[in-house]
Amino acid sequence: MKPLNILISNDDGVFAAGIRALAKSAQKRGHKVKVVCPDQERSATGHGLTLQSPLRVEKADELFGQGIEAWGCSGTPADCVKLALSELLDHKPDLVLSGINHGPNLGTDIFCSGTVAAAMEGTLENVPSMAISVASFKWKNFEFAGEIAMNIAEQAINDSWPASLLLNLNIPPCEKNKIKELSWTRLSVRKYKNQFSKREDPRGDDYYWLAGEVVLDLKSKGYGPKNWPSDVSQIQENKISLTPVEPDLFWRGNLDDLPKIDNSFVNPS
């Protein structure tokens, strides 16, 4: 295929090993790569934007090697892609990639994910976009994940990937010869307990750490093929999960299933 102009971002920050591996994987295939990502870790920032302070950027080419132009940005992952598309890039990219994330982005957790939010910014601007994660916080071998991501991205681009469709890729944390297959998946609904750990500082004041533990993964009842496996079950079986996600969150159920709202209060007589 002809070389693509690719924008890469993440939420783990400019010094993360995952984003460097992804950038190198894309560059090795002859693509033109530019990186705009947070200047420090900003995981779980969701789709937050910086409105109360200016955004600052610094060149970071030396972290990625020859031929890759890179910036570290003071903002969130969504800020990074928005700024790149509006100001930093000379031309609209052919593809936006976000990752490789150090840890999973599965099920309803994607609403908190800076990785997915960065990719979603590309989707909202009608650029084919994919979020990429390795489903372990301890896994360090990102080279194979980069190869998988580029294989999928190139195939999707060649097959008329709808720009309004975000692809969320999760790769199991195991060696290449132990990965079984790739499947389209549905989002799980993830439930947590003990979401906050209460502590006391030396002055006797309370503070809290967010420390939730997953206790239940439910299959979504939402729109889509009912025979698809959930993304969580796919990863648990050492299979690659690829989930199509749209920015349209509109509910598609029956009108009769909605709460009955008496609108007489709007213009009371």
Curated annotation (Swiss-Prot):
Gene3D superfamilies: Survival protein SurE-like phosphatase/nucleotidase (3.40.1210.10)
Reaction equation(s) it catalyzes: a ribonucleoside 5'-phosphate + H2O = a ribonucleoside + phosphate
Family: Belongs to the SurE nucleotidase family.
Cofactor note: Binds 1 divalent metal cation per subunit.
UniProt gene name: surE
MF-aspect GO terms: 3'-nucleotidase activity; 5'-nucleotidase activity; exopolyphosphatase activity; metal ion binding; nucleotide binding
This enzyme's EC code(s): 3.1.3.5
Coiled-coil regions, chain positions: none
Chain's role: Nucleotidase that shows phosphatase activity on nucleoside 5'-monophosphates.
Cited Pfam families: SurE (PF01975)
HAMAP family: SurE (MF_00060)
The name this protein goes by in its record: 5'-nucleotidase SurE
